[in-house]
Amino acid sequence: MENNTSLQQQLLEAGVHFGHLKKKWNPKMLPYIFAEKKGIHIIDLNKTVECLQETAAAMKQIARSGKKILFVGTKKQAKDIVNECARRVNMPFVTERWLGGMLTNFNTVRKSVKKMQSIEKMLGDGSFDSITKKERLTLSRDKDKMEKVLGGIAQLGRVPAALFIVDIGHEHIALAEAKRLGISTFGIVDTNCDPNKVDFAIPANDDATKSIAIIVNYLTAAIAEGLAE
């Protein structure tokens, strides 16, 4: 990984330091706030670098041990980045919407995944040739709908070892489920959120695409290193 100064410079250029309006702040973020500028809280990038490196080391360790980290980012600024990075390191992801019970009711979700996979297989191998075109179309549409929501976790055979969340406020249901099951949590935390809600908080702008991209890419590189070892 690059030295701290160049990493800090990259974070600065990506606008990682821009927090929310002061009036929206969560006082628990105080240790991570450097200043206030024109009514907006500015995040201390020294702290961001520190937290990012700690998170990267922990994620690398999980990946090295062969366990899975579930990437969660359903807001529009995060979707594409999360999808692309998770695929790059063969990690599961949720980018459309979080289905309640995705973790706490994992067995039921697995059944839906299996149903989706069997429809897919049967559509491909001619099993449905005897049904009408309309019925086949309906099945195909059902499969596509399921694929959209469940596609990213199709290969996840068991509950993941950890969750990596972009915007812990937006993904509060996913976070609550992980906490209930004692799953490790990593999260990008902006100035309007409570950093104590995750095991590893990365203080950063969670609204700008560039900011999300630099952090997710950095952590994905750490996971890739862990997988290679």
Where are the regions a protein language model picked out?
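N-terminal cationic and glycine-rich segments that engage phosphates or anionic surfaces
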Residues: 1-68, 74-75, 79-122, 133-136, ...
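Short glycine/threonine-rich loop/turn motifs
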Residues: 174-176, 181-228
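Residue-level signature of catalytic and energy-coupling elements of molecular machines
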Residues: 15, 71, 163, 215
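C-terminal interaction appendages of subunits in large macromolecular complexes
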Residues: 137, 142-144, 221-229
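Alpha-helix N-cap/loop-to-helix initiation residues
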Residues: 78-79, 171, 208
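Short His-Asn-centered micro-motif
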Residues: 72-75, 165-167
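Long, charge-patterned amphipathic alpha-helical coiled-coil/hairpin "stalk" segments used as oligomerization
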Residues: 89-196
